[in-house]
């Protein structure tokens, strides 16, 4: 299984490949996006939507750049940057669109936005888990049994994180599409 998160493909069966990409992504995010908690290259957005490059969706995003910036959704050097939204921002966003949408969809939107605001320390937890895992490098016969068990627990935890991030990515796509329909 593999999943693209923040423009990086995570493979549960190939830790070495993941490590290389993780370090590259860390350097990139630290150097260019120090305040952002979620970043996706445009081509990843395109692949999520099942569209081709230069699709109407991306063109619309660029066209309404100012509006999107107010919603903390911006492009930087070809990246779509989506910071996590706080509770007040969610309330403001719902208030902004509540008079323009079918009331039957409002509950669904609120539910989606609750998922987006899931947990601010989410990424931090993931990074710490992977760092703990890599402190053991690749397990071998010399490692104590309790350490191996700890590594397996971390792997299980990471599997859950990656599945939830995959779901979150779908939610974010829905959210952006929804915003565009309101403009």
Curated annotation (Swiss-Prot):
Q: What induces it?
A: Expressed in the late phase of the viral replicative cycle.
Keywords for this protein = Late protein
> What protein family does this chain belong to?
Belongs to the asfivirus S183L family.
Query: Which protein is depicted?
Result: Uncharacterized protein S183L
Whose protein is this, by species? African swine fever virus (isolate Tick/Malawi/Lil 20-1/1983)
């Amino acid at each position: 299984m593999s999943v693209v998160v923040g423009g990086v493909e995570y493979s549960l069966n190939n830790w070495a490949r993941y490590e290389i990409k993780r370090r590259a992504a860390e350097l990139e995010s630290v150097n260019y996006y120090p305040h952002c908690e979620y970043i996706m290259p445009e081509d990843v957005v395109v692949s999520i939507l099942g569209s081709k490059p230069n699709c109407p969706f991306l063109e619309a995003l660029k066209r309404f750049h100012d509006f999107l910036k107010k919603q903390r959704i911006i492009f930087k050097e070809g990246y779509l940057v989506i910071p996590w939204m706080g509770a007040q921002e969610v309330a403001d966003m719902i208030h902004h669109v509540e008079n323009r949408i079918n009331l039957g969809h409002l509950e669904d939107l609120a539910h989606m936005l609750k998922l987006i605001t899931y947990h601010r320390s989410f990424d931090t937890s993931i990074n710490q888990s992977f760092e703990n895992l890599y402190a053991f490098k690749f397990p071998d016969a010399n490692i104590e049994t309790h350490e191996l068990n700890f590594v397996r627990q971390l792997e299980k935890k990471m599997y859950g994180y990656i599945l939830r991030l995959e779901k979150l990515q779908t939610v974010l796509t829905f959210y952006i599409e929804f915003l565009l329909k309101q403009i």
